[in-house]
Amino acid sequence: MALTLVLALCACGGAPANPTTGNDATEPNGNTGSTTPVGYTFTYNGYQFGVDMIADAPLENLGEPKDQYTSESCAFGGEDTVYYFNSIQVSTNNEYGYERIYSIYLEDDLVSTEKGISIGNTVAQVKAAYGEPDASSSDSCLIYAKDGMKLRFNLNGDKVSSIAYDML
């Protein structure tokens, strides 16, 4: 729960706007909440999704959550909801009346990234799969930014201890 609150507090990016007719919703700053994933994506039960997506279809595909927690957002307007599923957490915001994914957190080694990296892999394995990390990386975190989002590998020594997909 504490990690979820940290992720919610660290989230940043533009607030979502009212959905339009069609598959995408455009924010005032030009970003879109979409039904099509961009950037680094995650596949679970055969369904590909990512951050900045309208959450309806991904949440439906994931099934009934084990638990969920809703609170007033401190990073956006509206409310944030964290959905807890087996092996992953999905965080959404509903500022304009629809939910948009702003964070996906991989909880254990039963799930992996699109390139096969999971909790417990080494720094060398992450770099072999994703290349050299962004300059904002450190000894405790490898960061890869792409298309308005970041894929973050938190480290404990030389091993991946958690994986998060976040909006920039």
What are these regions (language model features)?
Residues M1-L5:
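Sec-dependent N-terminal signal peptides
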Residues G14-L62:
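N-terminal, intrinsically disordered, polar/charged segments of Gram-positive cell-envelope systems
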Residues S34, T92-N93, Y102-I104:
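A short alpha-helix capping/helix-coil boundary motif
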Residues G39-F42, F76-G78, Y105-S112, I143-G148:
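Surface-exposed aromatic
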Residues Y47-F49, D56-N61, R100-S103, V111-Y130:
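A generic structured-segment signal
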